[in-house]
A protein has these predicted regions:
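Glycine-rich acetyl-CoA-binding "A-motif" of GNAT/NAT acetyltransferases
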Residues: 57-61, 124, 150
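Conserved GNAT acetyl-CoA-binding A-motif
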Residues: 74, 105-118
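Conserved active-site tyrosine of GNAT-family acetyltransferases
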Residues: 129, 134, 156
Length: 160
């Protein structure tokens, strides 16, 4: 079952009357917990222009953007889906929400390319990125230490 993305915006305390909200309390009070919605939130003041950004899709997981290159409009992406929500469409919904956030034509941090470096043994992550339309653009031999030994890394890329 596909997930319907509702709002995709940073979380700012000033947008809420109760200034005691944090990412955690926002999850408890404002994020719907049904099977058809997902929202990405960032900590107040967080911005990709600083070079990296973590977006939360509570309670499902989070997405990191890092190695932001404003000249070439690209960033690396990493995703973590909580164990109990894996293989239910939340990872794909999180990727799509992120892409929607950074392809807006008048967004000063609009991206042209997203890429992910994935440990070759992580077949679930490779399958997720393929399903989201990413294609393999690189293969690095023994690039990453994973479970106490070095493994190959596959670079996946998507032109937005």
């Amino acid at each position: 079952m596909g997930k319907n993305i509702i709002t995709v915006e940073p979380f700012h305390e000033t947008a809420h009357k109760d200034s005691t909200h944090t990412v955690e309390t926002f999850h408890e009070t404002a994020l719907p917990h049904d099977e058809t919605s997902l929202q990405l939130v960032a900590e107040e003041g967080a911005s990709l222009s600083s070079g990296s950004l973590r977006l939360y899709a509570l309670p499902y997981g989070c997405i990191d953007l890092y190695n932001y290159d404003p000249v070439n409009r690209r960033a690396a992406i990493g995703i973590m889906v909580a164990t109990e929500y894996r293989r239910q469409g939340y990872g794909l919904a999180m990727l799509k929400a992120l892409e929607n956030l950074y392809v807006e034509p008048f967004n000063e941090t609009a991206l042209h390319t997203l890429y992910a470096d994935i440990a070759a043994p992580n077949t679930a992550s490779l399958a997720l990125f393929r399903k989201a339309g990413y294609t393999q653009c690189g293969h690095f031999k023994e690039w990453l230490e994973y479970d106490s030994h070095f493994v190959d890394t596959i670079r996946m890329q998507k032109i937005l």
